Amino acid sequence: QNQPPDFANPFIIPQNAA
């Protein structure tokens, strides 16, 4: 299964920008 792009999922973005 290939997950959609990160920009398509605002929940799987890196948590670097708290």
From Swiss-Prot:
**In terms of domain of life, where is this protein from?**
Eukaryota
This protein's UniProt keywords: Cell wall, Hydroxylation, Repeat, Secreted
Determine if Secreted is one of this entry's keywords: yes
Q: Which residues carry this modification: 4-hydroxyproline?
A: P10
Q: What do the Gene Ontology cellular component annotations say?
A: extracellular region
Q: What is its main location?
A: secreted
Q: Where in the cell is it found?
A: Secreted, Cell wall
Protein known as? 22 kDa cell wall protein
